[in-house]
Swiss-Prot record:
Keywords: ATP-binding, Chaperone, Nucleotide-binding, Phosphoprotein, Stress response
Pfam family, one: HSP70
Matching PROSITE patterns: HSP70_1, HSP70_2, HSP70_3
The protein's name in its UniProt record: Chaperone protein DnaK
Gene responsible for this protein: dnaK
Record has Phosphoprotein as a keyword: yes
Species, as recorded: Chlorobaculum tepidum (strain ATCC 49652 / DSM 12025 / NBRC 103806 / TLS)
Length: 633
């Protein structure tokens, strides 16, 4: 049985971890980093870049570089007007859902997220040396059903069986509390990431991690603080030069990178200089942006964002039934909690110094890996009791939302209620499933609708319709309605906003596999071309050194084969390069057999581009060829 990995699929960065024995390990990616930018780019040649490679070229390719895709997961097009404005790429309306358009192709947010998940999967496979097929993936605690389902679909597309979707602050609490022995510790997890904010109140003790309440804002995170700085820089430059840099995609991407860098610097310094030479040009010549930003100015500009953090905290504490003074620890999670003002406000609100013992960028992935260990049986004596973040119910007479499951109910859970018809002789009912806290159905999120028909005609209020809500451990909902008189039942697995059909998921999985195959093929092609290049170089070098020792016919054959390989290499055609390399290798082999044993003789280059010689020959020859091999590289 393979390992179940833990993935923190973040708005800005993603992270992967796995249990090694009884300890979780964060895995470094191929670039040597423990976190990977949640970015995907498509180059002009059609190559797909993920992670750091995508981030590096974002300034020169803003239209085709996708970032913060998590903000679009499971969302309808009309739900993301602000997110759409902040994207440098095209967000389009396809069937009412937000999708990304690159060239003439559209991608769902699930597909883009799957590309990031594939990168995390590959990172884990490289580390473990084995195939990975199962994962625990984290989501913001305040993600609704549609967003959770979209995350699960992304995992499927990436070739992962998602064993569990768990809430980010809950995962962080698992990582924080795994080795804690204190009984009944009340912990607040304050999780401010790149795109979302969550606050969860938990009680930890005896290996039980019980979430008492959760709240948050899925539209608040580090990106919003970056945007404050972007707007300030753009406004200041407009005052100075009369040019709005927000209308230039490349300039805007440079502003975005500079804003993120400035925000990070202001966490350890009281001021920073933002210097962007050649940001734009006019008829008078190039224009440069040089602006000084103080921490005090940044904090003043971000005041409204800071204020938004604490209303969810008040609600979460109230719903937990704890007094704020009872909270033993406040654990900071998410990169944005490094902002000094956030830390100061958290201390002021909770009346205690926040706990910074966990790495805010890695702790969620570590918690996901621990949950993977629990599911696998490697971690025992840990019980996780999570909650549903939002109330669930159905629309009843008068357009009212009637709640069946209240927010912050421990999951998994099941709830049944009896409803009846609203009119005489009504033979069918529509079950309109809703999620949210507002009293009117129209103000809440529709998760799905289905009909129960063939109800025997009867006066209103007589038929008994039993509605059952069933939430699994992933927080995903199943609803059924049953006519108690006839036993007729209708059910629906909520497949809400942005939910993909099995056929769509299968197609996307095949596309993802094809892309992986294409990437591998491209890599092999590049390696072959590099080998050919190396072989050309070493052949020319040895012709210069050994030319006068070769018989004229052998030398001519080598030169002819060398020219053929050069032409094939120039054409870039793999089907031409390989035979040309084989031919050159063969004629070198023939020539080497004549030369072998002559003073100063050296064997031929090998087809893989590494010079090499016959074993059992002069040891000095072999040593000399090792040096040539090093030069070739």
């Amino acid at each position: 049985m393979g390992k179940i990995i833990g993935i923190d699929l973040g708005t800005t960065n993603s992270c992967v971890a796995v249990m090694q024995g009884t300890q979780p390990t964060v895995i470094e990616n191929s670039e040597g980093s423990r976190t990977t930018p949640s970015m995907v780019a498509f180059t002009k040649t059609g190559e797909r870049l993920v992670g750091q490679a995508a981030k590096r070229q974002a300034v020169t390719n803003p239209k085709n570089t996708i970032f913060s895709i998590k903000r679009f997961m499971g969302r309808k097009y009309d739900e993301v007007p602000n997110e759409k404005k902040l994207a440098s790429y095209d967000v389009v309306n396809e069937g009412g859902y937000a999708k990304v358009k690159i060239g003439d192709k559209t991608y769902s947010p699930q597909e883009i997220s799957a590309m990031i998940l594939q990168k995390m999967k590959q990172t884990a496979e490289d580390f473990l040396g084995e195939k990975v097929t199962e994962a625990v993936i984290t989501v913001p605690a305040y993600f609704n059903d549609a967003q959770r389902q979209a995350t699960k679909d992304a995992g499927k597309i990436a070739g992962l069986e998602v064993k569990r979707i768990i809430n980010e602050p809950t995962a962080a609490a698992l990582a924080y509390g795994l080795d804690k022995k204190k009984e009944n510790e009340k912990v607040a997890v304050f999780d401010l990431g790149g795109g979302t904010f969550d606050i969860s109140i938990l009680e930890l003790g005896g290996g039980v991690f019980e979430v008492k309440s959760t709240d948050g804002d899925t539209h608040l995170g580090g990106d919003d603080f970056d945007q404050v700085i972007i707007n300030y820089l753009a406004d200041e430059f407009k005052k100075q030069e009369g040019i709005d840099l927000r209308k230039d995609a490349i300039a805007l991407q440079r502003l975005k990178e500079a804003a993120e860098k400035a925000k990070i610097e202001l966490s350890s310094r009281t001021d920073t200089e933002i210097n962007l030479p050649f940001i734009t040009a006019t008829q008078e010549g190039p224009k440069h942006l040089v602006i000084n930003l103080t921490r005090a100015k940044f904090e003043a500009m971000s005041a409204a964002l800071f204020d938004k953090l604490f209303e969810p905290c008040r609600r979460a504490i109230k719903n937990s039934k704890f007094d704020i003074k009872e909270i033993d620890e406040v654990v900071l999670v998410g990169g944005s909690t490094r902002i000094p003002k956030v830390q100061a406000l958290v201390k002021e609100f909770f009346g205690k110094e926040p706990n910074k013992s966990v790495n805010p960028d890695e702790v969620v992935a570590i918690g996901a890996a621990i949950q993977g260990g629990v599911l696998q049986g490697d971690v025992t004596d840990v019980l996780l009791l999570d909650v549903t973040p939002l109330s669930l119910g159905i629309e009843t007479l008068g357009g009212v939302m009637t709640k069946l499951i209240e927010a912050n109910t421990t999951i998994p859970t099941r709830k049944q209620e009896i409803f009846s018809t609203a009119a005489d002789n009504q033979t069918s009912v529509e079950v309109h499933v809703l999620q949210g806290e507002r009293p009117m159905a129209s103000d809440n999120k529709t998760l799905g609708r289905f009909h129960l028909s063939d109800i025997p005609p009867a006066p209103r209020g007589v038929p008994q319709i039993e509605v059952t809500f069933d939430i699994d451990a992933n927080g995903i909902l199943n609803v059924s309605a049953k006519d108690k008189a006839t036993g007729k039942e209708q059910s629906i697995k909520i497949e809400a906003s942005g939910k993909l059909t099995e056929a769509e998921i299968e197609k996307m999985k095949e596309d993802a596999k094809a892309h992986a195959a294409e990437d591998q093929k491209r890599k092999e092609e590049i390696e072959l071309k590099n080998s050919a290049d190396s072989l050309i170089f070493s052949t020319e070098k040895q012709l210069t050194e050994l030319g006068d020792k070769l018989p004229a016919d052998k030398k001519a054959a080598i030169e002819s084969a060398l020219e053929k390989l050069k032409e094939a290499h120039k054409s870039g055609r793999v089907d031409a390069i390989k035979p040309a390399m084989d031919e050159l290798s063969k004629v070198w082999s023939d020539a080497a057999s004549n030369l072998y044993g002559q003073p100063g003789a050296e064997p031929q280059p090998e087809t893989n581009g590494h010079a090499g010689g016959s074993k059992g020959g002069d040891g000095a020859v072999n040593a000399e060829y090792e040096v040539i091999d090093g030069d070739d590289k």
